[in-house]
């Protein structure tokens, strides 16, 4: 994990929403959801180097945005007030998870920063306290802090561990960026799905994504990618898109599909994880 210049490398895995239902709109403008979150081994690497001068420096903000707007920088800044000593950090992001894809890359990076700096800075935040902090950064951050496959409700911050069968996933990213805000404010979005009484992996099947129909209508490229992937099995969109995926029981089956679609689209072959890699560190 250690590399020559004093930085340390930490994993930030992606996620898939194997099922996503919108159960209502909240008074604060957010939506209540119910979703199955699954970790996969497609991951970014977050490099961190401690500082003792209290400065937080993000060396390569994603997409050219100001560092103060980046989720990883904001995560460190949010946690800093709990540090026992004047603590700082330098951050580098090695991005492998595509952005704007529904895979949670930015949220996962932020969660990794919170998890590591909570130890480094001796902040003594519990997992639940970190989840509460993460929820102020984004709806997906709590799941990555929770660190296990889960059934999520609320805006995504209420999490219950869920056993998910070992699966391989073929993920296709169409050449388009989906605006999450546009989808959540769309008049055609389903917002009244019934809440689950017994939320288990088996009981929630057949899986669906309540955002999918609206995204297909507004972004034909996502529909095209979904249609192509559906030739090989049951396909579904993750999050608010743009990625679509299909699940396989073994790597060989997944690889055969990956070979077919990777010539047409940016595609990924990923294995499902049972827990966040940082839980093993």
From Swiss-Prot:
Keywords assigned: ATP-binding, Isoprene biosynthesis, Kinase, Nucleotide-binding, Transferase
Superkingdom in the source lineage: Bacteria
Protein's GO biological process: isopentenyl diphosphate biosynthetic process, methylerythritol 4-phosphate pathway; terpenoid biosynthetic process
E.C. designation(s): 2.7.1.148
Signal peptide span: none
Keyword Kinase: yes
Catalytic activity: 4-CDP-2-C-methyl-D-erythritol + ATP = 4-CDP-2-C-methyl-D-erythritol 2-phosphate + ADP + H(+)
Disulfide bridge map: none
Pathway given in the UniProt record: Isoprenoid biosynthesis; isopentenyl diphosphate biosynthesis via DXP pathway; isopentenyl diphosphate from 1-deoxy-D-xylulose 5-phosphate: step 3/6
HAMAP family: IspE
Purpose of the protein: Catalyzes the phosphorylation of the position 2 hydroxy group of 4-diphosphocytidyl-2C-methyl-D-erythritol.
Protein name: 4-diphosphocytidyl-2-C-methyl-D-erythritol kinase
The organism of origin for this protein: Neisseria meningitidis serogroup C (strain 053442)
